[in-house]
C-alpha cells in the first residue's frame, strides 16, 4: 500500500492560486485553497493574456481548445466578441488610428479576459471540484517543509506538506519566507 499524499495548502484564490489548484487537482494531488475574502469579490475588470501564457495553460489543463477559453472569458463575449486585442495605437483625444498591424499577415496573439470569468473558468476546467475555503485570512505558519500548519485569523488551523503563496503582491506569507 502506498503512502497517502499530504495536502498542499495554497494561500490565495486569484488566477494563480486557482490555476495551481486546478493543475494539482487534475493530477490527483490533494490541495486546499484559502482565500481571505468572500467568493463574490472582484479582482479587477480584465487582464491581457499573451499567447505563451494561455497556450501553456490550455496544454496543462488537458489540451483544451482556445475557443473554450475565449467563449468563457472574453469581456465582450455576451455581445458576440472574441476578446482579441487588435494592438492598434490611437490618439487618445481624437481616436485617430496612428499605427496598426496588418491583421491579414500578423497573427493575433493577445486576448483580453474578464478576471472573474477567468477565475470561474479555471475552477470549472476539470472533473473534480476545487476545494476553496473563503473567509480564511492567513495569520501565521508553523513547522517546516513536509509538515506545516497554517493558522488563520478565524481560528482555523490546517496541516499540510507545503504552502504555496499565491496571494499576490501584498502577500501575507511571502515576507516570511526568509524567517
Curated annotation (Swiss-Prot):
Any GO MF annotation of the entry: FAD binding
Pathway(s) per entry: Secondary metabolite biosynthesis
Domain of life: Eukaryota
Keywords, sorted A to Z: FAD, Flavoprotein, Glycoprotein, Monooxygenase, Oxidoreductase, Signal
TM region positions: none
Cofactors named for this entry: FAD
Record EC number: 1.-.-.-
Binding site for FAD: 35, 46, 119
Any Pfam family hit: FAD_binding_3
SUPFAM superfamilies tied to this protein: FAD/NAD(P)-binding domain
Primary enzyme class: oxidoreductase
Signal peptide region: 1-21
Listed InterPro entries: FAD-bd, FAD/NAD-bd_sf
Annotated glycan sites: 92, 170
Free-text function comment from the UniProt entry: FAD-dependent monooxygenase; part of the gene cluster that mediates the biosynthesis of neosartoricin B, a prenylated anthracenone that probably exhibits T-cell antiproliferative activity, suggestive of a physiological role as an immunosuppressive agent. The non-reducing polyketide synthase nscA probably synthesizes and cyclizes the decaketide backbone. The hydrolase nscB then mediates the product release through hydrolysis followed by spontaneous decarboxylation. The prenyltransferase nscD catalyzes the addition of the dimethylallyl group to the aromatic C5.
PANTHER family, per database record: FAD-DEPENDENT MONOOXYGENASE APTC (PTHR47178:SF4), MONOOXYGENASE, FAD-BINDING (PTHR47178)
Protein family (similarity comment): Belongs to the paxM FAD-dependent monooxygenase family.
Protein name in UniProt: FAD-dependent monooxygenase nscC
Naturally occurring in which organism (per UniProt): Trichophyton equinum (strain ATCC MYA-4606 / CBS 127.97) (Horse ringworm fungus)
Record lineage: Eukaryota, Fungi, Dikarya, Ascomycota, Pezizomycotina
